Design a protein with these regions (language model features):
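Periplasmic/cell-envelope proteins involved in peptidoglycan metabolism and beta-lactam response
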Residues: 1-282, 372-382, 494, 544, ...
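Sec-exported extracytoplasmic/periplasmic mature domains
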Residues: 104-108, 147, 174, 197, ...
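Conserved SxxK-family serine transpeptidase/carboxypeptidase catalytic domain
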Residues: 131-145, 151-163, 167-168, 172, ...
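Beta-lactam-recognizing serine transpeptidase/beta-lactamase-like catalytic domain environment
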Residues: 73, 209-213, 217-218, 260-300, ...
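Extracytoplasmic
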Residues: 57-60, 67, 76-78, 147, ...
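Acidic/histidine-enriched alpha-helical segments
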Residues: 115-122, 255-267, 326, 391-395, ...
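Soluble non-cytosolic domains of exported or imported proteins
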Residues: 59, 90-98, 132-136, 182, ...
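Ligand-recognition elements built from short beta-strands and adjacent flexible loops
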Residues: 496, 510, 541-725
């Protein structure tokens, strides 16, 4: 009986215990069913998080183009390598040692380091900096190893195919680790970041526990939004001429700074802008984070005399044949001297302009115009305010006008400071019939999806500081600065073209007080426009503290840039030279007919008979395309490119000028990039190789003396060169 009692009691206890447990579980079940909440977490949401997968649809940052649609900055594919370690995933790393042994050399890492990463207790790992920014080529090499668990995350990086080309204008963009998006940090990339930036889209769908999409699962798609494309006013050809010339001067004279701007005076469009030192936005080896063309105010020197002269002519107080005593001029306790210290005796004011006499301009400001009226013209030319060019970091100069001596010295560019872009803006009034144009670098912004232009820049007249008649008279006077035997601008004569302009030799303030002394311690400059009869280009060049010998003047490095860039640019724009009769035979302008459809042999012979160099591209028998195009003018012995039918084949460009390489790239729709200056001695595409549009063409250039040996080894020529003797 006792045994039965204990048995019944145990059964009762068990019954009660399991009944309570059942009711607790049932209550919990009812609660979960009713509320859907467990431990503060909404179960439906947690389930959705676990089985709802999200895939990013990558958008593309806007592309930056030059005025003709040549790419200057673009997004290109790059990849981050990752390893899946989760054994529950169908594809995961199964042999860390073997994977590390094969992968390490391609990532330029130690085998032990890779193996350590692959043995981490994590579901997925990456390989640090060596595993990011991987190119398509390297990705393919890794994929060929067929390593289980090794995968790639597609990304993009900003690429600048031309390296240092207009780098302070374009700037650069890079990924911000905090926001995981590319952000503009300098130049156009920064100024137009809102327009250029992209917005990634995404796809959401339900998956099984292994991550595979469930059959018939709905997709939620948010489409990506690509950034807008920005078209600059920069002309790739003119910018290339400028970069090439500046590289040569930098190498030869090792100056502290070089600043140059080329603009269209009719519109204010900036066609080229560059500074030295420069940087490659792909590497970001930046010494100076400011664009000196817009952010470096300094005493301009005698280029400022252009605007003092314009004010005097406009007010009718400049009498070119009136004489004055040059040499020195007293202003209170201060004595102003001409640059040669003694002057040239009694000379006319016209000769004073030609010789860049400080005394002439001191007298114009103080005795002809008057300081108050001169200040009004400084404001009319907007030297008291920034230009508003669409680049970050623009600064304005400082008009020093407190004391009598400052008012007078401002007239010849000393004391008062201005920026190069302010001088360019003011000079448009001289070259554009009195109308001063606002400088700008962005021509238009285009939506890549619709192709619609969302912003178009219209040329803006910011002021009319002088009359059209005054502008013409000033141009006439400035032309004599270049043509007169007494003119300081004689080094800036360009054969076949009339140039008007003014030289500048600006003193550099000494931090200890006063100004630096010495033959080299100046900012040498020239502000010129051509052709005189209808200026199409204005150009400012400044070279600070070049390493010139005592037999050289500051005009040597400045004219080396101005003359070559101005002449090449005028020819490129098909602006006909004013050819003197004695030069007709030497520089005959040739209007090219169309050779398309003709036999290669016939076209080649015709061009060679005109003294032109000819390069044949391809092995066909008929001409399919030519460059320059029909109707364009060239001068013998310029190069003409003839593309034949059939595949386009890369010629040997050894010894070519950068200008000819750019012609080739335009004809074949290649993406050119260059290193160095001078003439080509190395190319990345093998001569004879078939090329396709958008292939990258990289050339290295050097001086002729450096490529002579390489030229001697080239025994096979794939081009037919003229002229015929």
């Amino acid at each position: 009986m006792r045994k039965h009692k204990h048995t019944h009691r145990g059964a009762a206890i068990s019954f009660v215990f399991f009944s309570l447990l059942f009711f607790l579980l049932f209550g919990r079940f009812v609660y979960l069913q009713a509320t859907g909440v467990a431990d503060g977490q909404v179960l439906a949401v947690e389930a959705q998080k676990r089985y709802l997968k999200k895939q990013t649809l990558e958008a593309k940052r806007g592309t930056i183009f030059d005025r003709d649609g040549e790419i200057i900055a673009e997004d290109i594919p790059s990849y981050t390598i990752a390893a899946i370690l989760d054994p529950n995933m169908p594809q995961h790393v199964t042999d860390p040692e073997e994977t590390a042994r094969k992968l390490a050399p391609l990532l330029n890492m130690n085998v032990a380091d890779v193996e350590r990463i692959l043995k981490k207790k994590a579901n997925q790992v990456e390989f640090g900096p060596n595993g990011r920014g991987i190119s398509q080529t390297l990705k393919q090499k890794i994929e060929e190893l067929k390593l289980p668990g090794i995968t790639f995350v597609r990304d993009s990086k900003r690429f600048y195919p031309n390296g240092t080309f207009a780098s302070y204008v374009v700037g650069y963009a890079q990924k911000d680790e905090a926001t995981n998006r590319v952000e503009g940090k300098m130049g156009i990339e920064k100024q137009f970041d809102e327009q250029l930036k992209e917005k990634d889209g995404e796809i959401k769908y339900e998956s099984d526990p292994k991550g595979f999409k469930l059959p018939y699962a709905d997709e939620q798609i948010v489409p990506p939004q690509n950034g807008k494309n920005v078209y600059l006013t920069i002309d790739k050809h003119i910018q290339t001429f400028l970069e090439d010339a500046m590289n040569a001067v930098e190498k030869q004279y090792e100056p502290k700074k070089i600043i140059a701007i080329v603009a269209d005076p009719k519109t204010g469009a900036i066609l080229a802008m560059s500074t030295r030192p420069s940087f490659d936005p792909n590497k970001r080896n930046i010494e100076n984070y400011f664009n000196d063309a817009i952010s470096y105010p300094y005493e301009p020197g005698s280029t400022m005399k252009i605007f003092t002269l314009a004010a005097a002519v406009n007010e009718g107080v400049f009498q070119p044949n009136e004489t004055y005593q040059s040499g020195s001029y007293q202003v209170g306790p201060h004595r102003i001297r001409d640059h040669n210290k003694v002057g040239w005796g009694q000379i006319t004011f016209l000769e004073g302009v030609q010789r860049s006499s400080n005394v002439a301009f001191a007298k114009i400001v103080r005795e002809k115009l008057g300081e108050d009226r001169f200040l009004q013209y400084l404001h009319r030319f907007h030297f008291n305010e920034p230009t508003g060019i669409e680049l970050p970091g623009e600064k304005t100069g400082n008009i020093l006008y407190r004391y009598p001596i400052e008012k007078v010295t401002t007239g010849f560019g000393q004391g008062t400071s201005v920026t190069p872009i302010q001088q360019i803006q003011a000079a448009t009034a001289i070259a554009n019939g009195g109308k001063m144009m606002k400088p700008y670098v962005v021509d238009r912004i285009v939506d890549p999806e619709s192709g619609k232009t969302v912003m178009k820049h219209e040329p803006t007249v910011v002021d009319t500081p002088i009359s059209k008649q005054t502008a013409e008279k000033v141009l006439d006077i400035l032309e004599t600065v270049v043509t007169s035997e007494k003119g300081t601008g004689r080094p800036y004569q360009i054969e076949g073209y009339r140039v008007a302009g003014k030289t500048g030799t600006a003193q550099i303030p000494d931090p200890k007080g006063g100004y630096l002394t010495g033959h080299q311690n100046y900012i040498f400059s020239f502000l010129g426009m051509a052709p005189r009869e209808n200026p199409r280009l204005i150009m400012y060049v400044a070279v600070q503290q070049p390493n010139i010998s005592y037999t050289e003047t500051g005009a040597a490095p400045v004219s080396m840039i101005f003359n070559s860039v101005m002449k090449s640019s005028l020819q490129y724009l098909n602006i006909q030279p004013t050819v003197e009769k004695k030069r007709v035979k030497k520089e005959k302008s040739i209007s090219l007919p169309s050779y398309v459809g003709q036999s290669v042999e016939q076209a080649t012979q015709s061009l060679k008979n005109q003294g032109l160099h000819v390069t044949i591209i391809g092995k066909g028998t008929k001409v399919r395309a030519q460059f320059p195009k029909a109707g364009e003018h060239i001068v013998a012995p310029d190069r003409v490119l003839l593309q034949t039918d059939g595949n386009a084949m890369m010629p040997d460009v050894t010894g070519w000028s950068l200008r000819d390489v750019m012609k080739l790239a335009e004809l074949l729709q290649l993406k050119p990039s260059f290193i160095g200056s001078g003439y080509v001695f190395r190319q990345n595409i093998t001569p004879g190789a078939v090329v396709k549009p958008d292939d990258y063409l990289i050339v290295e250039l050097a001086k002729p003396s450096e490529i002579d040996k390489k030229q001697q080894t080239n025994t096979e020529q794939q081009e037919t060169d003229g002229p015929v003797d």
